[in-house]
A protein has these predicted regions:
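Alpha-helical transmembrane segments of multi-pass membrane proteins
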Residues: 1-244, 256-261, 270-273, 297-306, ...
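Conserved alpha-helical positions within TPR/SEL1-like repeat arrays
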Residues: 536-540, 567-579, 604-618, 648-659, ...
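Short coil turns that delineate tetratricopeptide repeat
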Residues: 563-564, 598, 604, 638, ...
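Soluble small-group transferase modules, centered on the S-adenosyl donor enzyme superfamily
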Residues: 202-300, 448-544
Length: 737
């Protein structure tokens, strides 16, 4: 009996610290995933999470010692566990609230990350840290040997941390998801509190509240989602999400564009990795993939099939492009995360019968495996093309940009093959870009760099680096195969000299590859970009509520935070001033949008802005100036349509400008083009009917209206269909007259 009593005397305290330490470590690992939607995943986020939680545990140990000396240990433990379970819920709520605070985005990026993590995770860390000292005091009060008891408490606490680490990293995140894990930890802590104080009725009350909140937060029913979003237990529902999952590496989401159901986006954490049109996968959406395509076309020398390797799968857009254009090719995709591949198959169009060969492992390990097989006398592929697509602008894998890795890639690259890398940097700072170029030149004798021509030297841009063993005329190849559609900037010797100077001729090696530090300017620029997006989202919300003056202020704050958004923001400000009747201010805002576009490196289309400006000038009675703006918009749209004749929105915009100038025939022809390309767009039907009616072409208008009504019926928009039916009758009456 004495042995059993002694066993329970030490078992209960050690089991308690095991569970509390297990929960702390689960919280630490989950913390980095929970904040990834707002802050991404980088060295900064991991540093902040580890530092803040260790600080919380330290403070908790200090406070817990005082609690142990002052209050009854068993009841204290029950209360601490109960409060800890409450803070788990608060963690979810705070993360959603803090992530939306605009003022945080004005801080430097490291301080922003630290502040966000501290506000969300410091309190639960402190509370869980208080438990171990109180448990130790409880064990000692039972008369157990001091040294052995303290040693057992420390050992089982460490064992709990180890178990929590492996369980979370290897199983729980992939199987349960971040939010479910947090609620599970909260439930465990609540159960522990009840076990320690069974007769405490407030704990039973809190258990009922906890279960109710967990139901609201976890049940997929619409009422639960709406209620949870109101109290920040969930993010607001996003109707654009088609697929969502959480893997060991990323939060994965596939979204559909609001303005085009055929346009899909593939997200990994905050990074929009891929974009595609489901009805035309050959129409590549990113400039870097189009550069990849034309270089591949130019260097393949009419080969029937290729041997290619892609480092990083994402949405598998470019590998599928190769599969389609060069059928029978060997395409090896090295994607570390099998859940990314699963998402691409289930929601992003990657077929299960694809000929693409996916290897789920780190690219460095795969290349090492190939080289071992080669040294062992086995035949391994010699790739014609290797594409690097595993780099984001926050935390690129350092092991894939070192000199040692480049040497290994060179060994599996054919003599006339090329290695292409897509990476993000700011040209003016150029630390990461310059270092990668410097490093590649140590392995490959010929290295070239190209990017989109419409970029700013002072903000983030995607660069494509092409490295090979033989000389190529990159500009000639691209110009021959891309048909003049791409406006590109080829970095020359002076540009490369600038990058070499900025990067201090740094060579990245396995021993020294500080990629996160090299990307600090990019991270800061990214923070300003995200901050401006918060202002823009707020401005749009205010605009929808009719609070136009406040919306204008929010747009102007976005411009001040991140001038790159000036074109978009000034255009919206002009629209708001127009709606408020302040036409002179509207003209000024539209002119500022055009001026910024002309002066900055970010050349964007101004046809829409010029159309808006022309409309306001007409209202002011300045018809000649208005016509000039409409004509400039028409010229720009025609240039774009020469290269991209299948852009229905451009044909629609062209029609709007012709209509504004009174050229109804040209407007109708343009609207018909838009409608032919996108027959399910109700706006195109509406505008075509209106311009045909204005032109007195009632018979044609009636035919279009009948199709419009059928479209509404097919979409189950019966009320709108009935309204259009009355409109149709009025058109038929006009035809009879």
């Amino acid at each position: 009996m004495s042995k059993t009593k002694n066993f329970m005397s030490i078992f209960i305290p050690t089991a308690t610290v095991f569970i509390s330490s297990f929960c702390i470590m689960v919280l630490e690992l989950v913390a980095s995933r929970l904040i990834a939607n707002y802050l991404g995943s980088s060295l900064y986020t991991w540093t902040a999470v580890i530092g803040v939680i260790l600080a919380g545990i330290t403070l908790g140990n200090y406070i817990g010692g005082r609690i142990a000396d002052t209050f009854h240990p068993r009841k204290s433990i029950a209360v601490l566990f109960a409060i800890g379970s409450a803070t788990c819920i608060v963690t979810v709520i705070l993360n959603n609230i803090v992530g939306r605070w605009i003022w945080l985005w004005h801080l430097s990026w490291p301080l922003h990350v630290f502040t966000h993590v501290s506000l969300v995770f410091l309190t639960p860390s402190i509370l869980l840290g208080t438990i171990s000292p109180v448990v130790a005091k409880m064990a000692l009060d039972r008369g157990l040997p001091t040294g052995r008891t303290i040693g057992d408490i420390y050992a089982w606490g460490a064992a709990g941390s180890i178990a929590g680490t492996f369980a979370t990293g290897y199983f729980m995140i992939a199987m349960m998801g971040t939010i479910t894990i947090i609620w599970t930890i909260g439930a465990v802590l609540l159960l522990m509190s009840i076990l320690y104080w069974l007769k405490c009725w407030p704990l039973s009350l809190w258990a009922a509240v906890f279960i109710a909140l967990m139901t609201v937060a976890m049940v997929p029913a619409e009422w639960a989602q709406e209620t949870a979003s109101l109290i920040a237990l969930r993010e607001g529902p996003d109707p654009s999400i088609l697929y969502e999952d959480e893997s060991r590496y990323y939060h994965i989401a596939v979204k559909r564009a609001a303005d085009n159901p055929n346009r899909l986006f593939f997200y990994q954490d905050r990074l929009k990795h891929s974009e595609m049109l489901t009805d035309d996968i050959l129409k590549l959406q990113y400039v870097y993939t189009r550069i990849y395509a034309v270089i591949t076309e130019g260097l393949s020398r009419n080969k029937e099939n290729l041997c290619a390797m892609a480092i990083g799968g994402g949405g598998y857009v470019f590998p599928r492009y190769i599969e389609k254009v060069w059928p029978g090719s060997r395409i090896d995709v090295i994607e570390i995360d099998p859940d990314v591949t699963r998402a691409a198959m289930q929601a992003f169009g990657l077929g299960k019968n694809t000929t693409i060969n996916t290897i789920h492992m780190d690219a460095r390990n795969y290349v090492d495996k190939l080289l071992e097989e080669k040294q062992g006398g086995r035949e391994v592929p010699q790739y014609d093309f290797i594409y690097g697509d595993a780099f984001n602008d926050l935390s690129p894998p350092f092991q894939l940009v070192t000199r040692e890795f480049n040497e290994k890639l060179s060994a599996i690259l054919s003599d006339d093959g090329v290695y292409m890398i897509n990476l993000v940097d700011i040209f003016d700072s150029g630390l990461f870009l310059g270092s990668v170029i410097n490093t590649l030149k140590k392995t490959f004798p010929y290295v070239y760099t190209v990017t989109g021509g419409n970029i700013s030297h002072s903000s983030r841009s995607a660069f494509v680096i092409v490295a090979g063993k033989h000389k190529i005329d990159l500009e000639k190849i691209i110009s021959e195969y891309e048909g003049g559609e791409l406006e590109l900037w080829y970095l020359d010797d002076s540009d490369l000299s600038h990058l070499r100077q900025k990067s201090r001729s740094l060579i990245l090696t396995d021993d020294y590859s500080p990629v996160e530090n090299l990307l600090i300017p990019v991270i800061r620029d990214n923070a300003r970009d995200i901050s401006s997006e918060k202002y823009l989202e707020h401005a749009e919300e205010l605009q929808q509520k009719g609070r136009f003056s406040e919306s204008v202020k929010s747009y102007l704050s976005a411009i001040k935070t991140y001038p790159v958004v000036s074109v978009r923001s000034y255009n919206e400000v002009g629209i708001l001033y127009d709606r408020m009747g302040n036409l002179e201010h509207a003209v000024d805002a539209f002119n500022k949008a055009i001026q910024y576009n002309n002066e900055s490196g970010h050349k964007m289309g101004t046809a829409n802005i010029r159309h808006n400006l022309g409309i306001v000038l007409k209202k002011l009675g300045k018809s000649e100036l208005a016509t000039e703006e409409f004509q400039k918009a028409v010229e720009e749209l025609r240039r774009d349509l020469t290269h991209h004749p299948d852009l229905d929105n451009n044909w629609h915009a062209l029609g709007l400008n012709f209509n504004a100038m009174g050229d109804f025939e040209a407007a109708a022809a343009s609207f018909k083009k838009a409608l032919a390309l996108n027959p399910d767009n109700p706006v195109y039907h509406d505008h075509l009917v209106a311009v045909l009616e204005q032109d007195g072409r009632y018979g044609e208008a009636i035919q279009v209206m009948k199709k419009y009504i059928q479209l509404m019926k097919n979409s189950k928009r019966d009320e709108e269909a009935s309204q259009l039916q009355r409109y149709l009758e009025s058109l038929e009456n006009k035809l009879k007259e």
